[in-house]
Curated annotation (Swiss-Prot):
Allows the formation of correctly charged Gln-tRNA(Gln) through the transamidation of misacylated Glu-tRNA(Gln) in organisms which lack glutaminyl-tRNA synthetase. The reaction takes place in the presence of glutamine and ATP through an activated gamma-phospho-Glu-tRNA(Gln). This is Glutamyl-tRNA(Gln) amidotransferase subunit A. The gene is gatA. GO terms for molecular function: ATP binding; glutaminyl-tRNA synthase (glutamine-hydrolyzing) activity. GO terms for cellular component: glutamyl-tRNA(Gln) amidotransferase complex. Pfam families: Amidase (PF01425). Its EC number is 6.3.5.7. Coiled coil: none annotated. It comes from Bordetella avium (strain 197N). It comes from the Bacteria. It is an enzyme of class 6 (ligase). Belongs to the amidase family. GatA subfamily. The active site is at K82, S157, S181. Heterotrimer of A, B and C subunits.
């Protein structure tokens, strides 16, 4: 057994937890093998910051808790964090030169909760600068690479997270999703990932991009692994003004999502050979039009047929404003980004220009040097649409369109379907640099994910096959508000009869 494969020898997170509890492996052994694996896979550029001593301190604490019988539910489980979450001890850069050397005095709530549950962090993961991008090519520290094909992008903005999970360097990873940044890299790297309902997971300590859109979510090999992570990550946080205290009739607290998952699973188990009988799957015509490549369409269609074999009913629906989500998003998100990123001025923290003659020049030079091209592009768009004379014509119109998009989803859920399924991305992963001369091409790649984000709905990506050049394809499963538990249970039923989520670049080559 190779050292890099140690944590994979015990199956999923539940299997790994059992192995740790039975002392068949220690948290320190897992951490050491994970660090060695990350070092051996340095060519992926998935990790930006690794500090072995910080990792081993956490691992020793997990082993001590296991020995004392006080271990949390994730004690000893090796994970890593997208570098959009601030972390005490590790640098927190958001993939930007602006924050190249920034050390946070506190942990983000997501980091804090996972660490309190005993998870052991191997480090910080690469991402598009300030989470702005669909390929991880906008990182100031170079692009992460797709483990399935090193010439391909891993997706973005949580590309390092998806690459690390796909290469099985970690058992799971955190990500953020503003317009598809968990779901898209999960799809392109052949792993599972979920964006929960907006407000379910605390944004405290998440470096902000679009405040009304940003939501944290995990990436992992399987739906059950996502459950283990998301159930710990979720819950009300008074430090986050956008955090929800209640999710319909249940408190927003750890345990809510697991309870919903268990309830759904119990119903499916009682249904026998067709566990999903009665489930209505809405399939939007707009997700299967021009722009969707035949290989992705075929893989998604095969997945839908598998769900039908499990007893689900396919229902044709319409989400008529699907394509309009692109202009709406690229008005609203840049507007919020231009406001959020105004704080990075070289005065309080972040990069400061070495030479300047006065305060104004110091600020302008610091921002010009510290921000990359895509971030500058979005700041300019945001400033423009918020400016006097254009606010009503662009920003307010985009917000009105956002409400209409949310209404389209609610109309579908009200009487037509229980969940919605379709592709995550219109094609498999592009080659690194393929869209360099046309940055808006990456914006179009989010056409199936943006509407979900604008509506604040939960959605996930699960592996469903391979397309051109043997690159992975993901199936998107969209639910109504607070339906994370049921989404995970539905995905789990699919993963019980397929093995796409178990395949890795190593096993596929073998």
């Amino acid at each position: 057994m190779s050292q890099s494969a140690l944590h994979t020898e015990f199956g999923d997170i539940a299997g790994l937890r059992a192995a740790l509890a039975e002392r068949r492996v220690s948290a320190v052994e897992l951490a050491e093998s994970g660090l060695a694996a990350a070092q051996a896979a340095a060519g992926l550029n998935a990790f930006l910051h690794i500090d072995p001593e910080l990792t081993l301190v956490q691992a020793r604490a997990a082993d001590a808790a296991l020995a004392a019988g006080t271990a949390g539910p994730l004690a000893g489980i090796p994970i890593a964090h997208k570098d959009a979450f601030v972390t005490r001890g590790w640098r927190s850069t958001a993939g930007s030169k602006m924050l190249r050397d920034y050390l946070s005095p506190f942990d983000a709530t997501v980091v804090e909760r996972l660490q309190a549950a005993g998870a052991v962090s191997l480090g910080k993961l690469n991402c598009d600068e300030f989470a702005m991008g669909s390929g991880n090519e906008n990182s100031a520290f170079g692009p992460a690479r797709n483990p399935w094909d090193l010439a391909a992008v891993p997706g973005g903005s949580s590309g390092g997270s998806a690459a690390a999970v796909a290469a099985r360097l970690v058992a799971g990873a955190t990500g953020t999703d503003t317009g598809g940044s968990v779901r898209q890299p999960a799809a392109l790297c052949g792993v599972s990932g979920i964006k929960p309902t907006y407000g379910t997971v605390s944004r405290y300590g998440m470096i902000a991009f679009g405040s009304s859109l940003d939501q944290a979510g995990p990436l992992a090999p399987s739906s059950r692994d996502l459950l283990e992570l998301l159930d710990v990550m979720s819950g009300f946080d008074p430090r986050d003004a956008t955090s929800l205290e209640r999710c319909d009739d249940a408190a927003n607290a750890p345990g809510r999502i697991r309870a919903a998952f268990d309830a759904a699973q119990n119903g499916y188990q009682a249904a026998g050979s067709q566990p999903l009988k009665g489930l209505r799957i809405g399939v939007p015509a707009e997700f299967f039009g021009a722009g969707l490549t035949p290989d992705v369409a075929a893989a998604v269609e095969a997945a839908l047929r598998q769900f039908e074999a499990l007893g689900a009913e396919r229902v044709a629906i319409s989400l008529p404003r699907t394509e309009l989500a692109i202009p709406a998003y690229y008005v609203i998100a840049p507007a919020e980004a231009s406001s959020n990123l105004a704080r990075f001025d070289g005065v309080r923290y972040g990069h400061r220009a070495a030479e300047y003659s006065d305060l104004n020049e110091m600020i302008s030079r610091s921002r010009a040097e510290g921000f990359g091209d895509e971030v500058k592009r979005r700041i300019l768009i945001g400033a423009y649409v918020l400016s006097h004379g254009y606010y009503d014509a662009y920003y307010l119109q985009a917000q009105r369109l956002r409400r209409l998009i949310a209404q389209d989803f609610q109309r579908a859920f009200a009487g037509q379907c229980d969940v919605i399924m379709g592709p995550v991305a219109p094609s498999v992963a592009k080659n690194i640099g393929e869209n360099r001369d046309d940055p808006t091409a990456d914006w179009l790649a989010d056409v199936y994910t943006l509407g979900v984000s604008l509506a604040g709905l939960p959605a996930m990506s699960v592996p469903c096959g391979f397309g051109a050049a043997g690159r992975p394809v993901g199936l998107q499963i969209i639910g109504n508000y607070f339906d994370e538990g049921r989404l995970l249970a539905i995905a789990d039923r699919y993963q019980q009869v397929t093995d796409w989520h178990q395949r890795t670049p190593a096993t596929q080559d073998a």
